[in-house]
């Protein structure tokens, strides 16, 4: 099946994404990796009137150490967790668990934020 028609927006900043989300709170869905959302749309289980694609927002894709804490952005790919030395050093359980998330192709697209939101 194909998804129902929808508008597609690719904001370049968090502020642009928030404006779109505020204007279309009840009808928009956020697209990160798409592993859960796209199949649900194809089966028309989910029929948003708008997709807000966060993939151009580089401010959400990071791994950094700051003030003795490890910070991971919501758009950081699961594959990054598997190979980033800072993750291995500071979050070894996360690093060891990541290869068990689906197949490498899925980890290449899946984001840490999407994984958390999907479980929520």
For the regions a language model picked out, list residue spans one by one.
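C-terminal structural segment of proteins
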Residues: 1-120
């Amino acid at each position: 099946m194909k998804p129902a028609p929808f508008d597609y927006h690719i904001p370049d900043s968090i502020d642009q994404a928030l404006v779109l989300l505020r204007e279309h709170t009840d009808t928009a869905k956020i697209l990160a990796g798409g592993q859960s959302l796209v199949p649900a749309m194809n089966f028309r289980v989910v029929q948003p009137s708008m997709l807000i694609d966060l993939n151009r927002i580089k401010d959400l894709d990071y791994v950094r150490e700051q003030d003795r804490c490890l910070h991971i952005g919501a758009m950081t790919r699961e594959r990054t967790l598997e190979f980033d030395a800072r993750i291995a050093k500071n979050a070894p359980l996360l690093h060891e668990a990541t290869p068990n998330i689906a197949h490498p192709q899925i980890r290449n697209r899946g984001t840490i934020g999407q994984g958390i939101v999907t479980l929520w």
